[in-house]
A protein has these predicted regions:
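Flavin (primarily FAD) cofactor-binding/catalytic cores of flavoenzymes
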Residues: 2-17, 23-41, 45-47, 76-388
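A short small-residue
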Residues: 66-70, 329-331
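Redox-cofactor-proximal catalytic regions of oxidoreductases
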Residues: 43-50, 55-68
Length: 388
């Protein structure tokens, strides 16, 4: 049995040390609140570093800005995943944010008047908790994937790095979203490649063009940050649809997939004789399958009654139905930009202000409850002021 260490009581614990957690840390420090950030990765930014090697942002660097510190370098370039990781690490160092790395939270529960955070042999007590991570953390893989021949290599966007991982032979990329298209282009340079699934649409312009950089991106940023929000009728109307709709292709276009020699095929509907079965009855002869089929919620470690019937956190702008528990970095938490490097800072400011105000209110309530009643005050010979 692991020995457990009970840490001192902390006002606020932030779970997650990515862009959401660091943004929360910036505003907590600004408000003078005692806090600690816990991150499962051994190094700040590793959630980005550990993604596939060729990954770049879809937006120019000038739109990458966490509160208080802009992204350095060429504002017109598209940052690599390692550049984003280094930026996050520099951000934490610059603002001296208290991040404890290599701590994977296994359970969050309530223990009397405080939260209990359990991570291996460690325990933390907190008056408030900010869960700072996206809704969807776990790759979604269909159940029939387990019926594929064991000799086939199966990967996801979380585990894929570069074509050197792959076995000789064909590659089937399942999912025609941005991750699937990017990875298909990457592997097609060295392997026969198929991409399966229904296209989710695409942005018609070249993101490297002058028009995109100086007209399209500013317009999209304005719409995503100021128009498609919970504060506008159109934002409230569109939110349910946007939460469940696939993002259109941004960098890679369908034409580029064809030009790269990638074969477009229909959906994968099952397994036949150990091979992926397409909806048209074909079974492509591949040795590798990369599942780019989205993600599922990764909040199973939260042992609190805070989820709705769909398994999503019950919250309004990050303030949950459980007093003292907050969320940050959720898709469309307030706006279409909420889960991005563009919009998470604004949400963090709101959440921290709400946390501070509610903490003050809760403390006043505790002080009032501790005050003696008139009868108790008289029995203890304590002067008790009465209204005239």
């Amino acid at each position: 049995m692991k020995s457990q260490f009970r840490a001192e009581r902390i006002h606020t614990v932030v779970i997650g040390g990515g862009q959401a957690g660091l943004s929360a840390g910036y505003h907590l420090a600004k408000q003078g609140i005692n806090f600690l950030i816990l991150d499962a990765n051994n190094r700040i930014g590793n959630a980005w570093r550990n993604r596939w090697d060729s990954l770049r942002l879809f937006t120019p660097a000038r739109y990458v800005e966490l509160p208080g510190m802009r992204f350095p370098g060429d504002g017109e370039g598209f940052p690599t995943k390692d550049e984003i990781a280094d930026y996050l690490e520099s951000y934490a160092e610059h603002f001296k944010l208290p991040v404890q790395s290599g701590v994977r939270v296994e359970r969050l529960s309530r223990d009397g008047d405080h939260f209990l955070i359990e991570a291996g042999g460690l325990q933390y007590e907190a008056d408030n908790v900010i869960v700072a991570m996206a809704n969807y953390q776990v790759p979604k893989i269909p159940a029939f994937a387990q019926d594929l021949d064991p000799s086939l290599l199966q990967l996801t966007p979380q585990s894929y790095r570069n074509p050197s991982q792959l076995q000789e032979g064909g590659v089937l990329v399942v999912g025609v979203g941005n991750s699937g298209a990017d990875i298909a282009i990457d592997v097609a340079r060295s392997h026969d490649t198929w991409i399966a699934g229904k296209e989710s649409g695409h942005i018609p312009w070249d993101i490297n063009s002058f028009l995109a950089r100086h007209l399209a991106f500013p317009m999209i940023r304005f719409l995503g940050h100021h128009v498609l929000t919970l504060g506008t009728p159109i934002g409230r109307k569109k939110r349910p649809e946007m939460l469940h709709r696939a993002t259109p292709l941004i960098r890679i276009k369908p034409k580029e997939l064809v030009e790269a020699g990638i074969q477009r095929v229909g959906r994968v509907i099952g397994v036949q004789e150990g091979k992926p079965l397409l909806e048209d009855g074909r079974t492509p002869d591949v040795r590798n399958v990369i599942w780019c089929t989205g993600y599922e919620p990764g909040f199973s470690w939260i042992d609190l009654p805070v989820f709705d019937q769909q398994g999503e956190p019950a919250q309004v702008r990050g303030v949950s139905s459980v007093p003292g528990l907050y969320f940050l970095g959720l898709h469309f938490q307030y706006s279409m930009s909420s889960a991005t490097l563009i919009g998470v800072g604004r949400d963090a400011e709101y959440v921290v202000k709400e946390l501070k105000a509610r903490s003050r209110s809760a403390e006043r309530g505790r002080q009032i409850r501790k005050m003696p009643t008139p009868a108790a005050a008289e029995s203890l010979s304590i002067p008790y002021a009465r209204k005239a």
